[in-house]
Amino acid sequence: MFNFKKLFYKTSLYSQAGQDLFAYELFGLNGTYIDIGAGDPIRGNNCYLLETNYNWRGFSVDFGDSNEDIRQNLKSRWLKHPERKNKIYWSDAINFNYMQGVNENSLDKNIDFLSCDIDPQEKTLMALKKVILDGIKPKLICFETDFYREKKDYSLLAYNFLEPYNYKIGVKNVYSNLKKNKIFETWFLRNDVDFQTIDYSTWVKKF
């Protein structure tokens, strides 16, 4: 069945809210990324399109799960997709050495895109802080807040941390799969990226 929403809205075959499309709009071909909490190699993945269609380089970090069977199942799914040539580290995102990861993969610390999405949200914030404190300077950060269900405003907490490092809010009130009641992310940009703050409902419309 034809999806009429695609006529009017920016929708990705892979990411939940078009994070990959936004990154490509900003930086085009041959970009760089770090994907924290990558999850499935394709479904819901923010960097699959960028790596396989647009020649982006980078790496993913995902512990998997505390349940070893679930963790091994996720690892096996990645092995079934050889088109995912960029490295994935099966590691704890909070204690991972991101500068070492950047160096091992011949990347620059000024990466284009950081996707930050692990559970619970407190750990997502901790992982974000670890990246920045390791000296990495992403131009775009897609940060999961799960605002629709969290008692804390993790978007505000992330902004309060990032603002002294010269970041601004790029896209606010990002919702999942065109469900306006499911605000779950904020997209931050470095101040040197020429982009004015907008609401996601404005960005996601094609016309």
What label would you give each PLM region?
Residues 48-49, 56-57, 109-116, 120-207:
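Conserved acidic-Pro-Pro-aromatic motif
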Residues 9-99:
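SAM cofactor-binding core of SAM-dependent methyltransferases
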Residues 8, 90, 112-116:
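Surface-exposed cleft-lining segments at the edges of enzyme active sites
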Residues 25, 103, 129-132:
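Short amphipathic alpha-helices and their capping/turn segments at secondary-structure boundaries
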Residues 101-107:
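Conserved amphipathic alpha-helix within the SDR
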Residues 1-14, 207:
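Membrane-proximal basic amphipathic "stem/tether" segments
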